[in-house]
Amino acid sequence: MRHYEIIFMVHPDQSEQVAGMIERYSALITGAEGQIHRLEDWGRRQLAYPINKLHKAHYVLLNVEAPQEVIDELETVFRFNDAVIRSMIMRVKHAVTEASPMVKAKDERRERREDFATETNEDSDAGDSEE
């Protein structure tokens, strides 16, 4: 079986259906003896350019190992699902399991925000004790 990186963008009005879509696509892959190495739901993000007069979309990234028949079926499902506004399936040489740069950046921002909140709380606690 080959390794693939799949990214698809969902219409922003259909964001609540993304969890179900991921579940269906995951079941399709694992049902054919495939493996999901990485699954990332990036959430709603700004598009670089408008697509069908839309400026935002819900992004999902999958790194999978699956037979060609499953990939063909996924392409067909993406094509006929009106909620999927764009999709791309690329073959990669190796399984990618590490976090994507998008998720790494998001985690770093979250850590910085938590550190700042902790520092702010410590500063306010120190200021209260001096009074």
From Swiss-Prot:
Pfam families: Ribosomal_S6. Residues 99-131 are annotated as: Disordered. GO terms for molecular function: small ribosomal subunit rRNA binding; structural constituent of ribosome. Keywords: Ribonucleoprotein, Ribosomal protein, RNA-binding, rRNA-binding. Transmembrane segments: none annotated. GO terms for cellular component: cytosolic small ribosomal subunit. Residues 120-131 have a biased composition (Acidic residues). InterPro entries: Ribosomal_bS6 (IPR000529), Ribosomal_bS6_CS (IPR020815), Ribosomal_bS6_sf (IPR035980), Ribosomal_S6_plastid/chlpt (IPR020814), Transl_elong_EF1B/ribsomal_bS6 (IPR014717). GO terms for biological process: translation. Residues 104-116 have a biased composition (Basic and acidic residues). Binds together with bS18 to 16S ribosomal RNA. PANTHER family: MITOCHONDRIAL 28S RIBOSOMAL PROTEIN S6, SMALL RIBOSOMAL SUBUNIT PROTEIN BS6M. Belongs to the bacterial ribosomal protein bS6 family. This is Small ribosomal subunit protein bS6. It comes from Sodalis glossinidius (strain morsitans).
